[in-house]
């Protein structure tokens, strides 16, 4: 089972997500915004309002939408680019 430790916005509906194993994956959610809970995420300014909820170890939005960390890991593509601190949410200080 995976969990999200950090996430940053790239562009469109793409996020760069770091998981507990330090694997960084680029996740494109553009094809996964079906259903009433995900409808608000189609609005890019709203989509960009995600945070990392460390109680459930995944990315969440203000309306309660979230994706399973295992699903995010599965659909993500490995990425060697560093996560830029200014754009990152979720790090514990």
Residue ranges, per PLM feature:
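Motif-centric detector for short Cys/His coordination patterns
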Residues: 1-93
């Amino acid at each position: 089972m995976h969990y999200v430790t950090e996430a940053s916005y790239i562009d469109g509906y793409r996020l760069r997500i770091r998981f507990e194993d330090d694997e960084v994956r680029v996740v494109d959610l553009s094809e996964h915004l079906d259903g009433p809970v995900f409808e608000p995420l189609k609005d890019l300014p709203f989509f960009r309002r995600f945070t990392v909820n460390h109680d459930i170890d995944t990315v969440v939005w203000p309306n309660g939408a979230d994706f399973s960390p295992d699903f995010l890991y599965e659909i993500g593509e490995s990425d060697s680019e560093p996560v830029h601190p200014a754009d990152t949410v979720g790090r514990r200080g």
